[in-house]
Swiss-Prot record:
Pfam families: DUF986. It is a multi-pass membrane protein. Its main location: membrane. Keywords: Cell inner membrane, Cell membrane, Membrane, Transmembrane, Transmembrane helix. Residues 27-44, 88-158 are cytoplasmic. Belongs to the UPF0266 family. NCBIfam families: PRK02913.1. This is UPF0266 membrane protein YobD. GO terms for cellular component: plasma membrane. Residues 1-5, 66 are periplasmic. InterPro entries: DUF986. The lineage of its organism: Bacteria, Pseudomonadati, Pseudomonadota, Gammaproteobacteria, Enterobacterales. The chain crosses the membrane at residues 6-26, 45-65, 67-87. It is found in: Cell inner membrane.
C-alpha cells in the first residue's frame, strides 16, 4: 500500500464521517427537530469538476496498469463525491434554542436582524456575518416565519 492509497483512504473516511454526521447525528443533536427545510443546492460545476478529475485519475491508473486497490479507492472516492454533491440534500434544521445551517449550530440569540429579499432569499444578520438562506420551496419561508414568531422561538423577537 502506497502513500497515495493511504491519502485516498483518509479522504474517503473523512467524506464518510461527514455523510454519517450530516444524515444521522446532526438531526439528533440539541433536542428534537421542530422543522427541517430543504435548501437549494449551490453550483454543481464544482462537483462535476471534482468527479471528472477522479474519473481521469481512474482512467490514468487503469491505462498505466496501476495498482488495483488504487483504482478501487479512486472509485470509492468518486462515489462518495457523487453522493455528497448530487444525492445529499442540504437542509436547515430548526431546534428549540437555535438551528443548524451548513452543519453549524447557531443560537437564536445571535440573530440581530432578518430580511426577505425580492427573490425569496431569507437573510439573517448575525454579529459578524450574514446568512443567505435559499429555500427550495418558497412556501417554506412561511413555515420558518410561523416557527420564529410562535412560542418556540419567541425569545428571538423580544
Amino acid at each position: 500500500m502506497t502513500i497515495t492509497d493511504l491519502v485516498l483512504i483518509l479522504f474517503i473516511a473523512a467524506l464518510l464521517a461527514f455523510a454519517i454526521y450530516d444524515q444521522f447525528i446532526m438531526p439528533r443533536r440539541n433536542g428534537p427537530t421542530l422543522l427541517a427545510i430543504p435548501l437549494l443546492r449551490r453550483g454543481r460545476i464544482d462537483s462535476v469538476i471534482f468527479v471528472g478529475l477522479i474519473v481521469i485519475l481512474i482512467y490514468n491508473n487503469v491505462t498505466n496498469h496501476g495498482a488495483l486497490i488504487t483504482t478501487w479507492l479512486l472509485s470509492a472516492l468518486a462515489l462518495m463525491g457523487f453522493y455528497i454533491f448530487w444525492i445529499r440534500i442540504p437542509k436547515i434544521i430548526f431546534k428549540q434554542k437555535g438551528f443548524f445551517f451548513a452543519n453549524v449550530w447557531i443560537e437564536y440569540s445571535r440573530i440581530k436582524a432578518m430580511n426577505l429579499s425580492e427573490d425569496g432569499v431569507l437573510v439573517m444578520q448575525l454579529e459578524q456575518r450574514r446568512l443567505l438562506i435559499r429555500v427550495r420551496n418558497i412556501d417554506d419561508l412561511e413555515k420558518i416565519y410561523k416557527l420564529l414568531v410562535s412560542g418556540n422561538a419567541a425569545n428571538l423577537l423580544i
